[in-house]
């Protein structure tokens, strides 16, 4: 079964997309075509959206699912006339919350992501810059400022995990790729030894690693199964020897990997 899902907002669309994606992920037997439509902030744009929604309904033979965080009532009324199934995220959750808190919400465009109202904005930017500056072992002299240092073989998911933790939680995460020399010595690189308490390992199934590396450097020693198998085996051996916690990233999303790391290491999120 295939359905179309729209994430519509008169702002960035981040809230609609994030919550909508989380809900759709619970329906693994359905394939969704996901379309994000930010800044639908005029009646003309809304009418254009209705045409897109109706076209998708006709194409799929089923109503598209619409997750919206549109504040403007006129625009919402126009969207409601489409052949889609609308889930108004703000009204769904704000009404019962207003009742519980005995207070009216400041229901305005971009409220959850505006720079002027977000005291953590600079924290997030600094964390992202830290992740980029300390990616792939490029710099090690700032490790004293890191909240976490991810270690593992090349292409095991260290960089996207560091960037996700920076964006989502404001965590300053560096990453360091273990080399064959490190594996053969079966001991931590000198640059990492002072920061043992900050280390967390990422490993991955050899088959998956070979497939990922093949996309980057096909038919090379780097992407061969035997090389990947060797690196994964020796890396896990090193991590166990040094008593560094690690997880296999193969079957987890970056969100799940990040959450597991923070729980295991007891690192507090800077953005709450």
Swiss-Prot record:
The scientific name of the source species is: Azotobacter vinelandii (strain DJ / ATCC BAA-1303)
Q: Give the protein's recorded name.
A: Putative phosphoenolpyruvate synthase regulatory protein
Q: Which parts of the sequence bind ADP?
A: 152-159
Q: Has the keyword Kinase been applied to this entry?
A: yes
Return the HAMAP family for the record.
PSRP (MF_01062)
- What is the annotated role of this protein in its UniProt record? Bifunctional serine/threonine kinase and phosphorylase involved in the regulation of the phosphoenolpyruvate synthase (PEPS) by catalyzing its phosphorylation/dephosphorylation.
Family, per entry: Belongs to the pyruvate, phosphate/water dikinase regulatory protein family. PSRP subfamily.
Q: Which UniProt keywords apply?
A: Kinase, Nucleotide-binding, Serine/threonine-protein kinase, Transferase
Record keyword Nucleotide-binding present: yes
Q: Which reaction does it catalyse?
A: [pyruvate, water dikinase] + ADP = [pyruvate, water dikinase]-phosphate + AMP + H(+); [pyruvate, water dikinase]-phosphate + phosphate + H(+) = [pyruvate, water dikinase] + diphosphate
Report the EC code(s) recorded for this entry.
2.7.11.33, 2.7.4.28
Give one Pfam family, short name only: Kinase-PPPase
Any GO molecular function? ATP binding
Q: Which InterPro entries match?
A: Kinase-pyrophosphorylase (IPR005177), PSRP (IPR026530)
């Amino acid at each position: 079964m295939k359905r179309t899902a729209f994430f519509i907002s008169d702002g960035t669309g981040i809230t609609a997309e994030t919550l909508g994606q989380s809900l759709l992920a619970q329906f693994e037997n359905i394939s969704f075509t996901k379309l994000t439509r930010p800044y639908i902030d005029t009646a003309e744009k809304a009418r254009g959206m209705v045409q897109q929604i109706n076209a998708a309904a006709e194409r799929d033979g089923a109503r598209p699912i619409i997750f919206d965080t549109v504040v403007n009532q006129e625009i919402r009324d126009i969207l409601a006339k489409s052949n889609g199934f609308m889930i108004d995220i703000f009204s769904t959750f704000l009404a019962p919350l207003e009742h519980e808190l005995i207070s009216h919400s400041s229901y305005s465009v971009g409220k959850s992501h505006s720079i002027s109202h977000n005291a953590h904005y600079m924290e997030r930017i600094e964390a992202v810059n830290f992740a980029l500056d300390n990616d792939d072992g490029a710099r090690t002299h700032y490790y004293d400022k890191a909240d976490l240092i991810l270690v593992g073989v090349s292409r095991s998911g260290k960089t996207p995990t560091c960037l996700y933790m920076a964006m989502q939680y404001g965590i300053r995460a560096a990453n360091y790729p273990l080399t064959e020399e490190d594996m053969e010595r079966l001991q931590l690189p000198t640059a990492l030894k002072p920061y043992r308490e900050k280390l967390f390992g990422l490993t991955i199934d050899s088959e998956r690693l070979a497939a990922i590396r093949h996309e980057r450097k096909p038919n090379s020693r780097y992407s061969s199964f035997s090389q990947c198998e060797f690196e994964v085996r020796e890396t896990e051996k090193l991590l166990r020897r040094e008593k560094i916690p690690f997880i296999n990233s193969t079957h987890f999303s970056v969100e799940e990997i990040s959450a597991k790391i923070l729980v295991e290491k007891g690192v507090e999120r800077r953005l709450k």
